[in-house]
């Protein structure tokens, strides 16, 4: 969101020695699948130096993301030099300086007018072209990392692809018959793994230091389910490369208890490896610079690096922010994300390991059987370790774990507990116990609530989020609670439809407790669009129309290396 009444459209005079420049029009066109990466990627925080810091703290933009998505009209180094030379001159205007030298981004879907006489489903299908970006061209002055194939973005301020969002968007694309677009997005993710070594948070340079919940294997499985298993084989190398990214450093961990490096953790002496969220940087996020910086300034210098690292790791989790990650649920400064073993992350990696094992076995080349056995064993080791560490028999629920002590966070139950059900690694008894508590405490008039704590953060009560609704609904269905799954589905779809009829919008999150209140919390206004909301709504609506999902019962978690798809 930009402020200032459209001031950026005016070329204002600035008392500086620099020469004014004019904007050029950006276009997109179809490009080769072997799209090269720019030789020097534009990194706003690094390349603009003091100008970046000053703009982000100035309040020129209400949203820190606006400036990092803006395109410099001349070389960033020249802009930085101009600023250094002219910023102390009499009458200097920072706002005017930025207006002359940057092309500012516009929200996705701006100008789209909703026809509320359409059904919600028809509205969503009409939005797919609005939310779809054509293949990118290489632009060394953009923070956008170009992708070679079309892709769907969430909408609003989110003008780029987002990793875990895309799985839930794909559910709706498949329900719309758009497996071609799903394939394009899978090809883009494989391209990112091949060029930058992992799937970043989003295709922006400022997201490169972290990823997001690793749903790539689930995407491949869903695509294969919608087409055929052979369609998954081209992604096997990328799946293994992504797994290596998440397991980087595992071989170098000492055998003792409580060892960690980047995203890998050895919980107990001689025990298997589990994973945590991480970020390779420990400074304020460029896209949320002002709020990060201002909170950091309330801490002593010795605590800031750890705070920023935890902020970034929380962004990698996708749950930014939530009482789930804070020692004090009311104090963001107490984030401890890097000290936690998340139950959902390890469920995802279990599924990825089983998927790789299954695809290796399916392909059947020389050596594949041995590799399949290795990954199947890794998955089983992870399953056993996670069930032992994260499941609390007394309360019948899964919790995140403080890896330094092995303590389960039993005072912080969240919808992350549904992930072991969705991915089929919980025992039948555990699945029944978790489902019972979800029904008893988390099911609200509009669906499942994210946590039981109202902290003011957006990933807390009273909010419900489309990805968590899907995982929870289908997780309890997988463990025999079809009636509960159907009830939650109908409540969520009812809330989606009610909001759509009242506002003409599909939003990124909803208040599931007070159905008349717009969801709140977070660092930015609730966004319209919205990719994962659309995807989950279409998939659930299609499921309701067509009857139960074909995979509705527990499959043995010790199953062999057959192809694995998500439920």
Map each language-model feature to its residues:
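Alpha-helical support elements that line or immediately flank enzyme active sites
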Residues: 162-192, 416-428, 469-482
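Extended glycan-interaction surfaces of carbohydrate-active proteins
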Residues: 47, 51-160, 184-190, 196-199, ...
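Aromatic/His-enriched, Gly/Pro-containing loop or helix-boundary segments
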Residues: 193-235, 527
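Short glycine/serine- and small hydrophobic-enriched flexible loop segments
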Residues: 171-175, 218-225, 351-362, 422, ...
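Long, repeat-rich segments with strong aromatic
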Residues: 335-363, 375, 458-483
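Bacterial N-terminal signal peptides that target proteins for export
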Residues: 1-11
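N-terminal Sec signal peptide cleavage junction
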Residues: 18-26
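Extended, well-ordered alpha-helical scaffold segments
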Residues: 178-189, 230-247, 352, 365-386, ...
């Amino acid at each position: 969101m930009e402020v200032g009444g459209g001031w950026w459209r005016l070329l204002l005079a600035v008392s500086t020695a620099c020469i004014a420049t004019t904007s050029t029009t950006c276009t997109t066109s179809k490009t080769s699948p072997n799209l090269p990466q720019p030789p020097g990627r534009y990194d706003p925080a690094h390349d603009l130096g003091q100008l970046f810091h000053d703009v982000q703290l100035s309040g020129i933009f209400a949203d820190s993301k606006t400036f990092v998505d803006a395109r410099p009209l001349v070389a960033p180094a020249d802009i930085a030099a101009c600023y250094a030379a002219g910023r102390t001159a009499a009458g200097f205007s920072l706002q005017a300086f930025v207006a002359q030298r940057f092309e500012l981004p516009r929200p996705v879907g701006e100008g789209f007018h909703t026809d509320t006489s359409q059904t919600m489903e028809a509205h969503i299908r009409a939005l797919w072209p609005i939310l779809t970006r054509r293949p990118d061209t290489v632009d060394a002055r953009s923070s956008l990392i170009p992708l070679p194939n079309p892709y769907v973005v969430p909408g609003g301020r989110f003008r780029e692809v987002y990793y875990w969002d895309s799985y839930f968007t794909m559910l709706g694309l498949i329900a719309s018959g758009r497996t071609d677009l799903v394939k394009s997005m899978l090809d883009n993710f494989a391209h990112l793994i091949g060029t930058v070594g992992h799937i970043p948070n989003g295709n922006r340079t400022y997201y490169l230091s972290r990823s997001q919940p690793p749903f790539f294997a689930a995407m491949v499985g869903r695509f294969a389910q919608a087409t055929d298993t052979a369609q998954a084989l081209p992604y096997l190398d990328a799946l293994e490369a992504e797994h290596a990214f998440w397991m980087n450093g595992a071989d170098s961990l000492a055998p003792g208890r409580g060892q960690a490096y980047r995203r890998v953790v050895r919980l107990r002496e001689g025990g298997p490896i589990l994973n945590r969220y991480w970020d390779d940087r420990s400074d304020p996020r460029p896209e949320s610079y002002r709020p990060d910086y201002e909170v950091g300034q309330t801490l002593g210098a010795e605590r800031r690096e750890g705070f920023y690292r935890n902020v970034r790791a929380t962004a990698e989790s996708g749950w930014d922010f939530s009482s789930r990650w804070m020692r004090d649920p009311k104090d963001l400064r107490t984030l401890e994300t890097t000290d936690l073993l998340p139950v959902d992350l390890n469920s995802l990696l279990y599924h990825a390991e089983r998927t790789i094992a299954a695809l290796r076995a399916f392909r059947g080349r020389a050596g594949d059987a041995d590799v399949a056995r290795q990954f199947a064993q890794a998955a089983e080791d992870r399953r056993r370790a996670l069930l032992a560490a994260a499941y609390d028999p007394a309360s019948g629920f899964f919790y995140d774990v403080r890896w330094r002590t092995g303590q389960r966070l039993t005072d912080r139950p969240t919808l992350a507990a549904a992930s072991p059900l969705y991915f089929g690694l919980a025992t039948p008894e555990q699945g029944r116990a978790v489902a019972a508590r979800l029904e008893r405490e988390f099911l609200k008039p509009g669906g499942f609530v994210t946590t039981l704590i109202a902290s003011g953060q957006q990933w807390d009560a009273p909010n419900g989020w489309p990805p968590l609704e899907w995982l929870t609904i289908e997780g309890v269905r997988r463990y025999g609670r079809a009636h509960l799954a159907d009830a939650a589905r109908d409540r969520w779809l009812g809330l989606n439809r009610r909001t759509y009829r009242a506002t003409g919008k599909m939003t990124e999150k909803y208040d599931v407790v007070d159905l008349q209140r717009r969801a709140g919390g977070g660092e930015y206004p609730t966004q319209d669009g919205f990719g994962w909301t659309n995807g989950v709504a279409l998939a659930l609506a299609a499921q309701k129309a067509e009857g139960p999902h074909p995979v509705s019962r527990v499959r043995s978690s010790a199953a062999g290396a057959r192809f694995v798809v998500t439920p």
